[in-house]
């Protein structure tokens, strides 16, 4: 049974925006179908009831904080690129932690960007979307390797999309098998797969069994759609490897997530680790 006294840590949360379409402009130049060009969020065809975006006069930080308080979320990991995130990190350092989204194609500039953001914002993670890079880059590519060493030097995990991309972009760069080489080459690196790893979720489990540093977070999936292989793994040998992450406000409301979560058949010992303890350890929160 899901406990009611564990304050969750959400490893993928953001802030509603009246101009949410603009934050996906970097992807649109690579999208080719007409329908995607009209979408506000390039993967919106996958989601029902996407949370309403705020009016220009609304306080985005207050909206997210209220949703967190309502659902028992103590800390949210947010990308430092938005103005709302910067305001939240300054005003509420006890409620928000910083991550940085990167594209490894400009290697030296990206390494410098990570180090500068870490110094300014006390980064807790570096994140990346291989299919969304321009051009796309598999996680096993040499362009990522200086990024990984920088993460090791700064004691940061790397979080990377795995599985078929939601936006209509080629997904071969997100084949889960790419992580096998990275784990071999960087045994000190903490790696977290995000966004499902489907249809290779069984392979993701095999690789997590093999590699101590490889983990999985449940971002962008409503709890009723968590892959069965992931739930089974958490309940057996993977209780320390599976971490909670939501997708508010990009595709899911916290209300929906926390309404569905109690129906996930995790064993009792898994819940505190899934909701909180694994995040504290892997992200050094």
Question: What are the residue ranges of the model-derived segments?
Answer:
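Mid-to-C-terminal alpha-helical segments outside catalytic/metal-binding sites
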Residues: 1-11, 18-70, 238-243, 251-285
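Short active-site segment of divalent metal-dependent hydrolases/proteases
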Residues: 15-16, 164, 198, 250
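Hydrophobic/aromatic residues located in beta-strands of well-ordered beta-sheets
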Residues: 8, 76, 96-98, 158, ...
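N-terminal cationic-hydrophobic initiation segments that often serve targeting/anchoring roles
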Residues: 68, 89-93, 118, 183, ...
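Active-site gating/metal-coordination segments in enzymes
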Residues: 74-75, 81-166, 170-173
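Short, charged, surface-exposed secondary-structure boundary motifs
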Residues: 107-112, 224-229, 253
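Catalytic pocket-lining loop regions of alpha/beta-barrel enzymes
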Residues: 124-125, 133, 137-243
């Amino acid at each position: 049974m899901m406990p009611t006294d564990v304050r969750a840590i959400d490893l993928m949360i953001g802030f509603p925006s009246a101009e949410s379409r603009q934050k996906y402009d970097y992807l649109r130049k690579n999208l080719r179908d007409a329908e995607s060009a009209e979408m506000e969020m390039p993967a919106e065809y996958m989601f029902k009831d996407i949370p309403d975006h705020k009016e220009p006069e609304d306080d985005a930080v207050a909206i997210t904080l209220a949703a967190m308080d309502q659902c028992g979320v103590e800390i949210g990991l947010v990308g430092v690129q938005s103005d709302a995130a910067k305001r939240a990190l300054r005003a509420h350092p006890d409620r928000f932690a910083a991550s940085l989204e990167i594209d490894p194609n400009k290697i030296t500039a990206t390494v410098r960007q990570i180090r500068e953001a870490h110094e300014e914002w006390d980064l807790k993670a570096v994140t990346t979307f291989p299919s969304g890079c321009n051009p796309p880059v598999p996680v096993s590519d040499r362009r990522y390797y200086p990024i990984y060493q920088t993460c090791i030097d700064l004691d940061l995990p790397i979080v990377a999309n795995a599985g078929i991309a939601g936006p209509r972009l080629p997904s071969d760069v997100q084949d889960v098998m790419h992580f096998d080489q990275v784990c071999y080459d960087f045994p000190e690196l903490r790696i977290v797969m995000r966004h499902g790893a489907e249809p290779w979720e069984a392979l993701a489990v095999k690789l997590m069994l093999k590699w101590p540093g490889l983990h999985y977070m449940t971002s962008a999936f409503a709890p009723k759609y968590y892959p069965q292989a992931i739930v089974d793994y958490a309940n057996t040998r993977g209780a320390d490897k599976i971490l909670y992450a939501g997708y508010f406000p990009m595709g899911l409301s916290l209300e929906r997530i926390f309404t569905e979560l109690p129906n996930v058949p995790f064993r009792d010992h898994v819940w505190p680790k899934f909701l909180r303890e694994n995040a504290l350890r892997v992200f050094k929160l």
